[in-house]
Amino acid sequence: SSKIKISGIDVIDPSFGMEAIWIESHKQAEAESTGYMVVEPESVLATHFSRILFRNAGKLIGQDDVQSLLDNLSESAPQLVQSVIPKIVPLHSLTGVMRLFLDERVPISDLRQVLETLSGMNLTNMSIQDMSEALRPDLAGLLIQRLAPLNEPLPVITFSSGLEHMLINMVRQSGEEGLVLDNALAQKLITSLVQANEKIGAEGKQAALVVSPAIRRQISAIVRQHIEDIVVMGLSLIHI
């Protein structure tokens, strides 16, 4: 970035939330010579639209889409597909799991691993949410690869031990109601996470919030309402 001011329209980049300036095309050379990175309007729009699709992928995928993925997998693993869908898991349940994965930025490219894991699980009385949580450890590698380049450290955000223990106790006490935070605590929590996430994002990196598996689902549901691009991972998925 440049500290030299150039004339244009001050805006916030819609994709990354960073300060930017719309300039006329004839000012490109001037902007570049003073240290600005210039991006073509088409690229800005394409990036913005792709991020919108990415954020809403869970709403867009349906049973026909999942069936197409299964048909592709059937070409290389026909017995696996036939033995799991729909004998063990109905198509609508698998679609629900895929939606939850996409909502939380978990890659669904390794459908073979998903079915292999499902084939060995006792799914009695398991909800779609329970299935997705049980499958996450087998997809942790893909998720981490998406967040951090190979051989690069994964930037993580964690809670203090005192706060995490308090949240775990709150989840245990609330039972089926889920985690309910009072406004003051929720605001303080979200503000701190936004600041930490923005600091890491300013370095061009993607952060992961790492918490106890006992509260991962509940924390993710709360945090994603305010910070769309953060990934909430259970500590058991991180191998130290």
Predicted feature locations:
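Membrane-embedded alpha-helical signal segments
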Residues: 1-238
